């Protein structure tokens, strides 16, 4: 089940105590600091979680070099926090997520956002959807669990297909992507709307890709 050849993003996360210079309720994304990759800082209860990772290319980004720049800018020492290396299974296409009495959810289903590298919301979403479809199946009211795969495709996969297209262009041409996408006054609000589920990538994808390709040419 799931992706036959998963696409992985190599990551390093750092858990920090205190907020540093990060304001209450504020999330920070860095585009261009990591070649063909990402860096972000999410607030937690009593602290901050920082992630650095790379999507494209055989050579991984040097996360320590990135953190040496990012952490002081956030108000922390360059060597602060506990480092943890890992990998994210990035969404890379529509795949069947159910079998005979089996469903895959979260990271096992390769649901991580291919542009923002966010995986918590799809993990929660897939868990809730799995429960919603398993309940009638266990009661004998449903003959299979195919509805789970269909539901995740509609609720998550359709948007991620557009997100993947944006990421493929953006991370290859980050300078152009920054000027035409991230630097725009509406960009922070659009990112927040995508993270919250208020908006999907399909709502903005065609305009963004058209801007990126026209500028590149």
Regions from the PLM with identified roles:
Residues 1-81, 89-96, 110:
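Predominantly flavin-linked oxidoreductase catalytic cores and closely associated redox partners
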Residues 132-217:
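C-terminal helical "tail/cap" subdomain of flavin- and related membrane-associated enzymes
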Residues 40, 66-69, 129, 133, ...:
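Alpha-helical scaffold segments in soluble metabolic enzymes
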Residues 57-61, 124, 142, 181:
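Generic detection of long, well-ordered alpha-helical segments
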Residues 6, 21, 39, 93, ...:
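Short capping/connector residues at structural and topological boundaries
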Residues 30-36, 57-60, 75-78, 87-90, ...:
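A general structural signal for short secondary-structure boundary/capping elements
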Residues 48, 92-160:
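Conserved mid-domain beta->alpha element of the FAD-binding
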